[in-house]
Amino acid sequence: MGDSDVGDRLPPPSSSDELSSFLRQILSRTPTAQPSSPPKSTNVSSAETFFPSVSGGAVSSVGYGVSETGQDKYAFEHKRSGAKQRNSLKRNIDAQFHNLSEKKRRSKINEKMKALQKLIPNSNKTDKASMLDEAIEYLKQLQLQVQTLAVMNGLGLNPMRLPQVPPPTHTRINETLEQDLNLETLLAAPHSLEPAKTSQGMCFSTATLL
């Protein structure tokens, strides 16, 4: 029923009251405009974007599967990143420990080389190779001296046991001759301590006679 029909059936307004009542009747008969409903949210999931031809239930299940796969991938990447960080930290710690051990080892070597240099007479070398060469030569000399002393001990020519010869003077010519005789006796006697005792006794008797 339109506004033209309502105007035909209602009498023409004769006053302001009738005009107002006429307008109220028109407004009461005019259908009230319904408020427009808000548009539905169009939340399209990633599954609906990639699979538009799939039905609603199937789309939801596929979207859940994709979301779960993404979470698993993120967890795997996070775990792998943590493992890489731990390995890197472990390598850094091992490198620092190795450097510290190497530094201590070099310090000990330098200390030992300085101590060895003090034992070698007239050693003025600074590099390690030259210092070791000097140490080898010095040890060879010491070894030769030890062998020489061993041979002298075997022959009874130990300098520690040989009597000291005083300077030749007119007053001690006889004593010098006696000591020479004692030395010849010591060289001719067997290698034992008895000749030394005998020579000492002879020296004592000679001194007594003088």
UniProtKB/Swiss-Prot annotation:
User: Which residue ranges does the record annotate as region Disordered?
Assistant: 1-49
Q: Gene3D superfamilies from the entry?
A: Helix-loop-helix DNA-binding domain (4.10.280.10)
The family database entries (InterPro entries) matched by this protein are listed as: bHLH_ALC-like_plant, bHLH_dom, HLH_DNA-bd_sf, PIF1-like_bHLH
Under CDD domains, the record lists: bHLH_AtPIF_like
SMART domains assigned:
HLH
Q: Name one GO molecular function term.
A: protein dimerization activity
GO cellular component terms, A-Z: nucleus
Q: What biological processes does GO assign it? A: fruit dehiscence
Q: Where does the record say this protein resides?
A: Nucleus
Q: Which UniProt keywords apply?
A: DNA-binding, Nucleus, Transcription, Transcription regulation
The residues that cross the membrane are none
The keyword Methyltransferase is annotated on this UniProt entry: no
Q: In which tissues is it expressed?
A: Expressed constitutively in roots, leaves, stems, and flowers. Confined to the valve margins of the silique.
Q: Please name the SUPFAM superfamilies in this protein's record.
A: HLH, helix-loop-helix DNA-binding domain
Reading the lineage from the top rank, the first entry is: Eukaryota
User: Which stretches does UniProt call biased (Polar residues)?
Assistant: 27-48
PANTHER family according to UniProt: TRANSCRIPTION FACTOR ALC, TRANSCRIPTION FACTOR PIF1-RELATED
Its quaternary organisation is: Homodimer.
Briefly, what is this protein's role?
Required for the dehiscence of fruit, especially for the separation of the valve cells from the replum. Promotes the differentiation of a strip of labile nonlignified cells sandwiched between layers of lignified cells.
What is this protein's record name? Answer: Transcription factor ALC
Gene that specifies this protein: ALC
